[in-house]
């Protein structure tokens, strides 16, 4: 089981189960609730006291960090069952609702999800938008499904901005897996499209964050 070559930074968190106990057939996208780089995002999950992690962090600048290898289960969605079958991705976002992401982060997220699906044998990414239907569905060969943190805990994650883009993400990734090289701008997110990437000076500590 490989990891994405798109990762620009690697810092493995101790917060994980190794190995995962289920094949990868799910993508779970989260909002980080802070405009972090991939490096800073991975650093947040280093203390064992954090009791949380993810497989990848996507930074506001489009950087991608590997935090937990794909062969291992991250601690991300408040559901052991979901985490064992999902690749979890924390995406840099604003710190208030609807938790918008930058255009650079969105583009990197699309690239990363496409790469994950392709390497794990998926030709189609499915978004049902319904917890019961999704959890009852057994992905067929060549399929992966999308789940969200809010289904497993009293959280707003991934925020309405990214949540409203899930259908678009699934369609675009499926299109790319079919051989198309076209890209889609995030036109259906809450309150407009993804923001243009800007430079931030960020000083963050673990206690500052309200991840998920």
Model-derived regions, located:
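Divalent metal-coordination and catalytic microenvironments
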Residues: 56, 89, 109
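Short polar catalytic/cofactor-binding loops
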Residues: 33-34, 152, 206-210
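SH3-family beta-barrel domains
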Residues: 185-210
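Basic/polar, cationic surfaces and motifs that engage anionic cell-wall
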Residues: 2-11, 16-21, 95-193
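Cell-envelope and extracellular/periplasmic
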Residues: 33, 70, 80-98, 114-118, ...
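Structural preference for beta-strand elements that scaffold enzyme active sites
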Residues: 26, 86, 145-147
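N-terminal catalytic cores of peptidoglycan-degrading enzymes
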Residues: 1-83
């Amino acid at each position: 089981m490989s990891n994405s070559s798109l990762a620009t930074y690697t810092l493995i968190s101790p917060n994980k189960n190794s190995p995962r106990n289920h094949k990868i057939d799910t993508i779970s996208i989260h909002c980080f609730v802070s405009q972090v780089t991939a490096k800073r995002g991975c650093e947040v999950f280093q203390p064992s006291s954090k009791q949380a992690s993810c497989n990848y962090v996507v930074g506001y600048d489009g950087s991608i960090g590997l935090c937990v290898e794909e062969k291992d289960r991250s601690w991300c969605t408040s559901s052991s069952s979901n985490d064992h079958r999902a690749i979890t991705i924390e995406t840099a976002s604003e710190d208030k609702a609807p938790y918008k992401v930058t255009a650079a982060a969105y583009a990197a997220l699309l690239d990363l999800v496409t790469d994950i699906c392709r390497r794990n044998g998926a030709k189609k990414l499915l978004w049902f938008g319904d917890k019961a239907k999704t959890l009852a569905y057994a992905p067929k060969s060549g399929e992966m499904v999308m789940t969200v943190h809010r289904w497993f805990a009293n959280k707003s994650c991934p925020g309405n901005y990214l949540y409203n883009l899930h259908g678009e993400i699934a369609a675009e990734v499926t299109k790319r897996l079919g051989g198309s090289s076209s890209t889609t701008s995030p036109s259906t997110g809450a309150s407009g499209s993804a923001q243009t990437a800007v430079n931030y000076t960020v000083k963050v500590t673990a206690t500052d964050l309200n991840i998920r």
